[in-house]
Amino acid sequence: MQYNLSFKDKTNPKALMGTITHKVMQTLGDKKVAMNKGLDIVEDEETGRNLTLEECDDLELLNNIAFDYYTNAFPEVKIGDKERRQCLRWAEKAIAFKDGMLDPRNQDVFATELFFDIEIKKPWAKYKYEFEDQTIEGYLSIKGTVDLILDQGNGFFEILDYKTGRRLDWATGEEKTYEKLQKDKQLLLYYYALKNMYPDKEFSVSIYYINDGGLFSMVFDEEDYEDAEEILRKKFEQIRSIQQPRLLSNEHTHWKCQKLCLFRSEYEDSGKSICQHIRDEVKEKGVVKVVEEYGKIDKIATYGDGGGRLADDSDSKK
């Protein structure tokens, strides 16, 4: 819906607050990168602000900049001064953990908000589709953004992912234990992506639950790399085989429909939700025709929101 058909999805208050805290942590890391390069200014292309190194130590200033930027970008999300203060407390808590152990300013920062776009040139990952008068072909790509990469020396790097929410598997409602995090798809795919980008480097993966459990660190190996690729292969083949997508809940009674998804909204006075309308369109016309009619072909392979990055949604349907 969002990536192939250009419908704009919902951002909820907790998610937006998490993005704000991520932005504060990113700026602290950007300060360290600037210092390593001998610079005295941090240029933030996202917010358009240039900050001195001294300003980068002002956590309240960073929080206010991030809060104002993202609330202006998402005016439909109603958060105010109470949430502004909460975001600041989260950032303060994050950098205070174990006497500043996870404060980016105390680390050797290799990169912040590192974007990856990995094309998997394997026979199983090849695709070819006909749309209107175009042929779209290539290989499956995975795209994303890593919060922070730390240089631990001797060719060893640590991928660090921040989480402000609960330590739950939202698909099952169960707590993510260390054992479950060892098989966490997001963390495995981070490892897979970075090993593709930097094959000569070694990576560990850490996830820091600021408000629910602290730091968990995993060391992956070649077997985990292969597991990650197998996850991708199975998901790709599953998606490719679908001709008639199923709704999570036909009547939108599932909690994800109620709390997380904007597509339950009515589609153009049709008496149907957006997802119901598209379901019926696919049933009548087929997937290809629906993508041709509703989609933006030039947007299908582009990256949306990630980390502090905002998608260009000028063509998105509200």
Model regions: which residues?
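Short, hydrophobic/amphipathic alpha-helical patches that form generic packing surfaces
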Residues: 1-3, 19-30, 191-192, 263
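C-terminal, charged and often intrinsically disordered regions of DNA end-processing helicases
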Residues: 1-15, 306, 310-318
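Hydrophobic (often cysteine-bearing) scaffold residues that line and stabilize catalytic clefts
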Residues: 13, 17, 21, 83, ...
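Short amphipathic alpha-helical segments and their helix-coil junctions
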Residues: 1-8, 73-74, 165-172, 234-243
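Short, polar/flexible loop-turn hinges at active-site or ligand-entry regions and domain interfaces
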Residues: 5-13, 32-37, 77, 173-176
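Mg2+/Mn2+-dependent nuclease catalytic core
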Residues: 116-234
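A non-catalytic, helix-rich entry segment at domain boundaries
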Residues: 24-127
